[in-house]
Amino acid sequence: MSQEQQIAIEERFARVFNDKSFKERLSSTDFEKYINSKKKLSFQKHDTIFEDGETPKGVYVLEKGAAKLSKSGAFGKDQILRFIKEGDIIGYRSLLCGENFQAKAEAMTDIECIFLPADVFMYLLEVDPQLSFAMLQKISYELGESSNTITFLAQKTVRERLAEI
């Protein structure tokens, strides 16, 4: 997938997942439910947002700062899975799958984010087709990226992998 397509998907999500857009699309009752349940959270650099193995309680949308998703590998060494930037949403994959988090999320800088409880996020996906479509695009993009990474790691020699960096 091209970088232009990735940017278009991220921009679509940003247009759909915000107070103004929700107010335009949701019923007044649903909008109030959203507004009353979301929380603004702050984390300092190196704070843990959620732990690997923890039960998801909701999703986080990063408004300011940067974070990382990592998994502890062999001998306790952390492997960074991806970086989280402003506008990104995390926690949804485990929530949608009904499983515990498969990675740790940690603030790389001081961050501010919106936390949306699981029940409200799931409800919004049910009642808001635009949000559902934006999430479907986001998940599909990430699945494609994962497939590309697996192919890259499995089919290329170390020399070929280093040449592409």
Q: What is each of the regions a protein language model found here?
A:
Residues 121-122:
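A generic structural signal for short hydrophobic patches within well-formed alpha-helices
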Residues 112-113:
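All-alpha effector-binding/dimerization core of bacterial HTH-type transcriptional repressors
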Residues 108, 126-165:
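Polybasic "coupling" helices that flank or enter modular domains
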Residues 41-43, 105, 143:
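Short, flexible turn/loop "capping" segments at secondary-structure junctions
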Residues 1-45, 89, 94-95:
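Cyclic nucleotide-binding regulatory module and flanking cytosolic helices
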Residues 22, 47-109:
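Cyclic nucleotide-binding regulatory domains
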